[in-house]
Amino acid sequence: YFKVYVKIHNIKNLKASTYDLKKSMSLPSIINTLVEGNNYNPNTIKLTFKEGKRVTDYIALIADNTNNTKEEVEKVFADKKYLNELITKYWFLTDEILNSEIYYPLEGYLFPDTYYFNDKDVTVSKIIETMLDEMKNKLNDYKNKINNSQMTTHEILTLASIIEKEGKTGDFKDISSVFHNRLNISMKLQSCATSYYGLGLEFTDVGIATAEMMNSQNPYNTYIVPALPVGPISMPSLNAIEAAINPKNTNNLYFISDNEGKTYFFETAKEHADKKNELIAAGKWER
């Protein structure tokens, strides 16, 4: 309603900052506060955390834009005592994140969005908990469905993080369907994105996964592990989380994307192989 009100009344020049707003304030009063800049803080910092990025990217962003050093940020992210405190505070965080095989316990749990903080002296814990609060707000809408699911929240976020890396938003539910169908018949997910993550690489670093990469022995590589990897491989968007919870109903087990980002889905390995050969012949897929 806020956005509609602003658009209808052609309100401009809202000042981005942190404000002390009261629940009793009317919408016009809130708008006036934002326009006038009452309590405006010129030291406010804006941090934009993008979906599909990793904990390491978020750590770098925090270190580059606050008065916390990279070492200080990394220390908080890895602090087991602090992680246990977070587990007691947030219903969707469990001991699963403390698995010793997981590279970064909070991978997949910090909701990607734009956040504002008072100044560069903001603490790492304040940033983390602000993002966890937003993840809680988003997941609360799905809590009943998650609780009635055969998957844990950790598994759902793990799947969502893979979906996020494997395609475009419009294909998320189809991709989710493929992975759910594979999981249901104990078929390996064979996601290149997981093999990249297990080796600390990105697709942009190496291109198409090599046989050596796909055979790499690590707890994230779904060419090796029989089901889901040990944990998330990126920070998933709400669209990816929604897709992981509510996949499209199909019988597809395979998909392939061409060089232009178009994704094709198939029920059989032969259909997949035929399309791959067709794309290669047309110069639309790189070996």
Predicted feature descriptions by range:
Residues Y1-E134:
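Signal peptide-directed extracytoplasmic domains
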Residues T48, Y82-R287:
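Bacterial extracytoplasmic/cell-wall-associated proteins, especially those involved in peptidoglycan
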